[in-house]
Amino acid sequence: MTSEITYAEVRFKNEFKSSGINTASSAASKERTAPHKSNTGFPKLLCASLLIFFLLLAISFFIAFVIFFQKYSQLLEKKTTKELVHTTLECVKKNMPVEETAWSCCPKNWKSFSSNCYFISTESASWQDSEKDCARMEAHLLVINTQEEQDFIFQNLQEESAYFVGLSDPEGQRHWQWVDQTPYNESSTFWHPREPSDPNERCVVLNFRKSPKRWGWNDVNCLGPQRSVCEMMKIHL
């Protein structure tokens, strides 16, 4: 009886020791496999980040394309409108390399000088209506920048008429302004002697005086009907 008890105790102790070894082995195994699980999660996170990056990049390219297409459509529409306003053009080929073709054009019945086109009206209207007429032709009233430009214009005018230009004094304070916002330069003006002479005359015409014989600028009432000169940039094809 005594030997049986001893055997049972020994067996129990051995089983306990064996169980302890298995438990320790299992814990060690879990510790070894834990880093392996964290490593497998990193590639997934990297793939997800790259996917989001390329998705955002694709969206950015799409938005940029849409904006570009809209602007291109607006420019094309503007060019088409201008071509419809001036259905007939008179063009001169520019000096360009052989592989390039470029034409500088003015609408039919307009005068060409340097980089601009000029239309000399035969109808009389107020200064404001004259500017509106120019705007309907995608132009504005004449802005004189050089003596050469003015001399060219004078050669195409009739001495018995006066012609509105794009210079005015809206407030009557002798603060002259060009319609295209070109700064008014006192040293580059071509007023007749003793002009401008009346603060109530707020618009400017080109007219010819016989004494002395010369063309020049004269301030006049803006409502009085006069002929006019329109100006626009040349159209390049």
UniProtKB/Swiss-Prot annotation:
Entry function: C-type lectin receptor that binds carbohydrates mannose and fucose but also weakly interacts with N-acetylglucosamine (GlcNAc) in a Ca(2+)-dependent manner. Involved in regulating immune reactivity. Once triggered by antigen, it is internalized by clathrin-dependent endocytosis and delivers its antigenic cargo into the antigen presentation pathway resulting in cross-priming of CD8(+) T cells. This cross-presentation and cross-priming are enhanced by TLR7 and TLR8 agonists with increased expansion of the CD8(+) T cells, high production of IFNG and TNF with reduced levels of IL4, IL5 and IL13.
Locus of motif ITIM motif: 5-10
Listed GO MF terms: calcium ion binding; carbohydrate binding; D-mannose binding; pattern recognition receptor activity; transmembrane signaling receptor activity
Protein name (record): C-type lectin domain family 4 member A
Reported effect, residue 6 to F: Decreases HIV-1 binding/entry in cells as well as virus replication
Binding site for Ca(2+) 1: 143, 145, 149, 231
Parts of the chain that traverse the membrane: 49-69
Chain ranges of the C-type lectin domain: 113-231
Keyword entries, A-Z: Adaptive immunity, Calcium, Cell membrane, Disulfide bond, Glycoprotein, Host-virus interaction, Immunity, Innate immunity, Lectin, Membrane, Metal-binding, Signal-anchor, Transmembrane, Transmembrane helix
Cellular component annotations (GO), alphabetically ordered: external side of plasma membrane; plasma membrane
SS bond list: 106-117, 134-230, 203-222
Quaternary structure and interacting proteins, as annotated: May interact with PTPN6 via its ITIM motif.
Gene responsible for this protein: CLEC4A
Residue intervals annotated with topology Cytoplasmic: 1-48
Domain notes: Contains 1 copy of a cytoplasmic motif that is referred to as the immunoreceptor tyrosine-based inhibitor motif (ITIM). This motif is involved in modulation of cellular responses. The phosphorylated ITIM motif can bind the SH2 domain of several SH2-containing phosphatases. Involved in the interaction between HIV-1 virus and dendritic cells. Enhances HIV-1 binding/entry and virus infection. Requires ITIM motif-associated signal transduction pathway involving phosphatases PTPN6 and PTPN11, SYK, Src kinases and MAP kinases.
GO biological process, one term: cell adhesion
